A protein has these predicted regions:
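Short, acidic Gly/Pro/Ser/Thr-rich loop/turn segments
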Residues: 19, 73, 90-93, 177
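Active-site beta-strand/loop microenvironment that shapes enzyme catalytic pockets
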Residues: 81-93
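Short boundary/loop segments of OB/S1/cold-shock single-stranded nucleic-acid-binding domains
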Residues: 137-161
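Cytochrome P450 core scaffold surrounding the K-helix E-X-X-R motif
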Residues: 91-101
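Contiguous, small/hydrophobic- and glycine-enriched helical/loop subdomains that border
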Residues: 1-81, 102, 109-137
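Conserved RNA-binding domains used in RNP assembly and mRNA/RNA metabolism
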Residues: 152-204
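Conserved beta-strand residues within beta-sheet cores
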Residues: 60-65, 142, 153-155, 166
């Protein structure tokens, strides 16, 4: 997959140091999506949709992508650090047609180019606030994630390598895993690291 990062965007990584076991951070990417959405709203007045689990969407097109990873201490098996990488399309720019068709920007959507320094500050502040509430207020921000997640209620393709399965996204569980009933009557909670979820009728 090719990533396009044109001038005028906001691209950065934040290192967090939560004291937790790795399994307690299954929902880290979802938390980062809520943090990014809150920051975009604070700067632009627009709260973007969330495409499960790591994209923000405006007008059915991708505004922001999020990648997370964790490092584990060898002896304690606890999390040593967590890295949240975020890219937000801020400025209206010329992109290759195949990218432009699925790419949104804050300037194109709102008519105003955002202050990237202000957006970065809002995002770091939001991430730090949610890191503090990672466990104590988990239900609240998971509800916020679900309320803005456009994947829920949609027919989707679950792509795992060369294996493609069609399903309906029913909701998320307490770890932000996607709940999907399969056509054969079975159900599963799909974790973000296991599969790629793609919309049936377009990007989102």
């Amino acid at each position: 997959r090719t990533f396009v990062s044109p001038p005028g965007g906001l691209y950065f990584s934040v290192i967090l140091r939560p004291h937790a076991k790795p399994e307690a951070l299954m929902h880290l990417t979802a938390m980062a999506a809520v943090a990014a959405a809150r920051a975009v709203f604070a700067v632009s007045g627009v709260y973007p949709d969330i495409k499960w689990t790591n994209d923000l969407v405006l007008g059915g097109k991708k505004l922001c992508g999020i990648l997370t990873e964790i490092g584990i201490e060898a002896e304690s098996r606890e999390v040593d650090y967590a890295v949240v990488g975020i890219g937000i399309n801020c400025a209206r720019v010329d992109l290759p047609p195949e990218v432009s068709a699925m790419s949104a920007s804050l300037e194109a959507f709102t008519g105003q180019k955002p202050d990237r320094a202000r957006l970065a500050a809002a995002l770091v502040r939001s991430l730090c606030e949610l890191e503090q509430a990672l466990f104590t207020e988990k239900d609240a921000w998971l509800r916020e994630f679900a309320a803005h997640c456009i994947t829920i209620g949609q027919d989707v393709k679950l792509v795992r390598g060369d294996d493609v399965t069609y399903a309906h996204a029913d909701g998320i569980d307490e770890e932000a895993a996607l709940l999907v009933p399969y056509p054969d009557g079975t159900k599963a909670a799909v974790a973000s690291g296991e599969v790629s979820v793609r919309g049936m009728y377009g990007y989102a």
